[in-house]
Amino acid sequence: MALFNSAHGGNIREAATVLGISPDQLLDFSANINPLGMPVSVKRALIDNLDCIERYPDADYFHLHQALARHHQVPASWILAGNGETESIFTVASGLKPRRAMIVTPGFAEYGRALAQSGCEIRRWSLREADGWQLTDAILEALTPDLDCLFLCTPNNPTGLLPERPLLQAIADRCKSLNINLILDEAFIDFIPHETGFIPALKDNPHIWVLRSLTKFYAIPGLRLGYLVNSDDAAMARMRRQQMPWSVNALAALAGEVALQDSAWQQATWHWLREEGARFYQALCQLPLLTVYPGRANYLLLRCEREDIDLQRRLLTQRILIRSCANYPGLDSRYYRVAIRSAAQNERLLAALRNVLTGIAPAD
């Protein structure tokens, strides 16, 4: 039975209510947010420009779209900012109006919700535990002319796995040849050093739509900022016309403009994840009764080999919240997702897991 009503991580209010404590007393490993926090440059810009909330945002978000265009070296007409990447998912689903779409499971729940709202028939391609939850070329044969679009998350959520580039290119080529729109969710790709994703390939393939998020990497989930990128100017113009006006608030737009210029923050994040991510992964692998999947992003998928242990409930008693993956199609109650946080926070989780899985209290 599900412990929480929410279909997503980061629901610290509900978890704190279960415990009868304040939300700030919980250590949250359920939301995949950069533990370095918001860049200082962004925080300073927001404080210095608070009076911008007394005016309507620029309806065209000219400066934000220009900043995103410079960042990716593409025309601004290819980009449409949204109130978090989730809004962009719903925008592209309602704008394309597919009759039949394929989604890969386990995966982010909002693809299915957005497609269902558009009255679309949904087909599911199931990743296999036997393949380590990695996408394989078997999906190519499932891409048939009667499909209108395919949603892929790269790296995938909740597995953190990124398919090999040749396979992704083969999928993109097949989608183009069959007139299938390929929607690539690259929400977590910024955490992978020097991984450009598929935005550079858009000029040669207007069938590719890329979803991006600034929420996770720059730690601004409360502001909400994502965007959609596609090289078909006419199609993007249609998306723009159907989007709700003033979808992005003024502070979120400003945060995006400033964050994209902070290359030092990008380097600091990559350094943290390279060092702490590797250490945390190895430490988790040393724990008994736990299988850890080698994700590329800022979170890891775990499988507990003791079905009688509800890790989420047990850790919650120690005021630590992790994400149960039982509600992901294809996964079950043995699976959990944990964010990679600071070394001290990760040590606290490791000690709690060790205590639960072995019954041996960690040494002082």
Swiss-Prot record:
Database matches in InterPro entries: Aminotransferase_I/II_large (IPR004839), CobD (IPR005860), NHTrfase_class1_PyrdxlP-BS (IPR004838), PyrdxlP-dep_Trfase (IPR015424), PyrdxlP-dep_Trfase_major (IPR015421), PyrdxlP-dep_Trfase_small (IPR015422)
Names of the cofactor(s): pyridoxal 5'-phosphate
S-S pairs: none
Residues with N6-(pyridoxal phosphate)lysine modification: K216
Family matches, as Gene3D superfamilies: Aspartate Aminotransferase, domain 1, Type I PLP-dependent aspartate aminotransferase-like (Major domain)
Pathway(s) the chain acts in: Cofactor biosynthesis; adenosylcobalamin biosynthesis
Keyword hit for Heme: no
Role summary: Decarboxylates L-threonine-O-3-phosphate to yield (R)-1-amino-2-propanol O-2-phosphate, the precursor for the linkage between the nucleotide loop and the corrin ring in cobalamin.
Subunit structure: Homodimer.
Entry protein name: Threonine-phosphate decarboxylase
Annotated source species: Salmonella typhimurium (strain LT2 / SGSC1412 / ATCC 700720)
Gene: cobD
